[in-house]
Amino acid sequence: MNTSAPVLTADQAEAAALIEEWFYHLNTQIFVLCGYAGTGKTFLVDYVVRDMGLVPGESAVFVAPTGKAASVLIRAGVPAGTVHSLIYTREEDIEVDENGEVISERFLRFVKKEKIDSGIRLIVLDETSMVSDDVLRDLLSFGVKCLCCGDPAQLPPVGGSNTLLTMPVVTLKEIVRQEKDNPIVRLAERVRAGGLPRFGTDGCVEVVPRCECDRALREELFAKADQIIVGTNRTRAAVNREVRAMRGIPPEQLLPTDGEKLVWTLNDWSK
């Protein structure tokens, strides 16, 4: 064990002991670690991996279902990639000219790899709730132990199902000290407990009744917002149109203009 270990919460310490017991002594391939936002799942797993003498990115690989989720791990100091980049190859139809220059390329499908790096002893799967049972089955087919982490309150996979988080081995419940004042974490806790968000400003979160959110108020809120989270693609498109109109961008201007943020929707880590 690492003698200079950081201070863990009580449930983090319990989870760490169970994970190490599972990794060294149990034959089961999967360990399911659940935890709500702010409970320190990423911190705990990174600590446990290093405490067991594994090397993140080498003997222990961290993967997530999307590039966005993987980038969150990377920003936390954990080397990570997507599940698909680990276990699949991309099959493409590529057209070249007489000089061998690529004219066009069209993605066809993902094909499961025959094998992955033999030095991998542990796969850490983050955001497990978003991984379909089919992809999970492919991931487990390589026979490597898999530590599956996730938040049971998050979204299920698009067009699929995932039952892992309904049967966790251990669940982190205690919000770590540095997250207790996070207004988003507080709001999530309140909703999970069956309460309703309180209207008004809570830190950087502003909760507004739909019936009061007229155009003037939306303009005021949108002008100072760094990000706007919505529930559907339809609402997202409507909000984007409204914000662009507020900034004087004509509706026929479909391409991005200077200063607009972009969201890359295709995971292709080779480019």
For each of these PLM feature ranges, what is it?
Residues 1-18:
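N-terminal pre-Walker A segment at the start of P-loop NTPase domains
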Residues 8, 62, 228:
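Conserved SAM-binding loop
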Residues 12, 66, 232:
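Short, conserved phosphate/pyrophosphate- and ester-handling motifs at nucleotide-, phospho-/glycolipid
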Residues 15-31, 39, 138-144, 149-271:
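Conserved helicase motor core of P-loop NTPases
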Residues 44, 48:
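Hydrophobic positions on the alpha1 helix immediately C-terminal to the Walker A/P-loop
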Residues 50-61:
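Post-Walker A helix-loop "phosphate-sensing" segment adjacent to the P-loop in P-loop NTPases
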Residues 61-118:
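Inter-Walker segment of RecA-like/P-loop motor cores
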Residues 118-136, 146-154:
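SF2 helicase catalytic motif II
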